[in-house]
Amino acid sequence: MFKIIRNPVPKIAIPLIILLFAVSCSKDQNNFLPYVRVNLYIPLATYNHLTIPTNSVLFQHEGYRGIIVVCVDPASNAYYAFDACCPYEKDYSGIVTIQPIANLPSQPGTIYSSDFLGICNKCGSKFNLISGGQPIEGPANHFLQRYNISSGMGSITVTN
């Protein structure tokens, strides 16, 4: 009356399920850098340059090789934060810099810019900072490593 089912799952199904779990657990971000704890508090009253769209500030002594914070849209609290380490250089020696604004006083250890491009000082790769750190020219083919941003109450906090 009852039929015994010896192999209810085809042999191909188990490897497919394992592959599905392996692929679905991968991250979209390029985490190529060694872990460095990041917790950067930025008061916008001090860094009011970050209240203007496309403006950026490089904090040279934060993160692995510095942290670049970019204002995308201050009305909606939209900001990006990236590590300044170039993803192309395998020895982590390339630093993505921003073009400084001449004659603009800045805080110690910071560079202010109104340009939305970051350029590696070693390989020359260029990155679009307002489109998520996308490489647009040069040998780099990975995005800059992003950090988490929370903003509000007149400040920005960058964490990992």
Outline where the language-model segments fall.
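Bacterial Sec-dependent N-terminal signal peptides
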Residues: 1-45
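Generic detector of short alpha-helix boundary/capping microenvironments
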Residues: 13-14, 74-75, 121
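N-terminal pre-ligand scaffold of iron-sulfur
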Residues: 26-113, 129, 143-160
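Short Cys/His-rich metal-coordination motifs, predominantly Zn2+-binding knuckles/fingers
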Residues: 89, 122-125
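Short, highly charge-biased, low-complexity peptide segments
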Residues: 137-142
